[in-house]
């Protein structure tokens, strides 16, 4: 008996190699351009109520650069995600 090998290249597609994400280190990150510091906002500021959020928005608008926006009423539900 003899062996007979036949290759069906049309049926077997070569699997693409998974793309590796390029690692970024500190030397690849440049200084910010056109940066304007307007306010400090922490997670505790949002939990203190909507008056605080409104105050932060007013503070940021007073610094300038926010003239293109339109006012909008937004309702947010805060969810406590404490790890047990």
UniProtKB/Swiss-Prot annotation:
Coarse class of the protein's main subcellular location: cytoplasm
Q: Does the keyword Membrane apply?
A: yes
GO terms for biological process, alphabetical:
phagocytosis; regulation of cell shape; regulation of Rho protein signal transduction; regulation of signal transduction
Q: Which domain of life is it from?
A: Eukaryota
Residue ranges of domain CRIB in the record: 29-42
- Show the GO cellular component annotation of the record: cell projection; cytoplasm; cytoskeleton; phagocytic cup; plasma membrane
As for membrane topology, the entry says: Lipid-anchor
Q: Where is the lipid attached (S-palmitoyl cysteine)?
A: 10-11
The UniProt GO MF terms for this protein read: small GTPase binding
At what positions is Phosphoserine found?
43, 52
Which subcellular locations apply to this protein? Cytoplasm, Cytoskeleton; Cell membrane; Cell projection, Phagocytic cup
In Pfam terms, one family for this protein is PBD
Q: Which UniProt keywords apply?
A: Cell membrane, Cell projection, Cell shape, Cytoplasm, Cytoskeleton, Lipoprotein, Membrane, Palmitate, Phagocytosis, Phosphoprotein
Q: Which residues form the signal peptide?
A: none
Q: Does the keyword Ribosomal protein apply?
A: no
Domain description: The CRIB domain mediates interaction with CDC42.
Assembly and partners are described as: Interacts with CDC42 (in GTP-bound form). Interacts weakly with RAC1 and not at all with RHOA.
- Main role? Probably involved in the organization of the actin cytoskeleton by acting downstream of CDC42, inducing actin filament assembly. Alters CDC42-induced cell shape changes. In activated T-cells, may play a role in CDC42-mediated F-actin accumulation at the immunological synapse. May play a role in early contractile events in phagocytosis in macrophages.
- Which family, according to UniProt? Belongs to the CDC42SE/SPEC family.
| Name of the featured protein | CDC42 small effector protein 2
Gene name, Swiss-Prot/TrEMBL: CDC42SE2
């Amino acid at each position: 008996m003899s062996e007979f090998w036949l290759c069906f290249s049309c049926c077997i597609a070569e699997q693409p190699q998974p793309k590796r994400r390029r690692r970024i280190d500190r030397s690849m990150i440049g200084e910010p351009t056109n940066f304007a510091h307007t306010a400090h906002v922490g997670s505790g500021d949002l939990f203190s109520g909507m008056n605080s959020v409104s105050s932060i928005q007013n503070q940021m608008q007073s610094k300038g650069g926010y003239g293109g926006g339109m006012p909008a009423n937004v309702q947010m539900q805060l969810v406590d995600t404490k790890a047990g």
